[in-house]
């Protein structure tokens, strides 16, 4: 059961990284995102892909996946709450509600991945 959960998490990780990377490049090309943020998100996606590939090759990379999902969770939380703040202060563009919805979905997906990877990395053996 644990191995099947790792494989499902690896597939979720690959899908999330691909969707996130495409979304970041679309955001950068349409709205001119700050370039260091783009590199930071690309680094997080690279870390997610490395963790997913390691999990698909064999067990034992759940800690790496947990760190990668934690980084993705932090980044998506930051962007989600910044978009919500801009929307509440009425200084958001016309597409702000759609952006907030997309960031909310990314926030939920990253939270799910982080929670599953954290529960998989929890030590199950009794301490001596």
Residues of each region from the PLM?
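Loop-to-transmembrane helix junctions at the membrane interface
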Residues: 51-75
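Juxtamembrane loop-transmembrane helix junctions in multi-pass integral membrane proteins
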Residues: 1-8, 29-35, 56-63, 91-94
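Hydrophobic transmembrane helix segments
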Residues: 9-46, 77
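Alpha-helical transmembrane segments of multi-pass integral membrane proteins
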Residues: 8-20, 70-78, 105-113
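Interfacial non-cytosolic loop connecting adjacent transmembrane helices
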Residues: 25-38, 76-104
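Alpha-helical transmembrane segments in multipass membrane proteins, preferentially the mid-helix core
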Residues: 46-55, 113-118
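Cytosolic juxtamembrane helix and N-cap/initiation of the first transmembrane helix
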Residues: 1-17, 116-128
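Alpha-helical membrane-associated segments of multi-pass integral membrane proteins
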Residues: 91-125
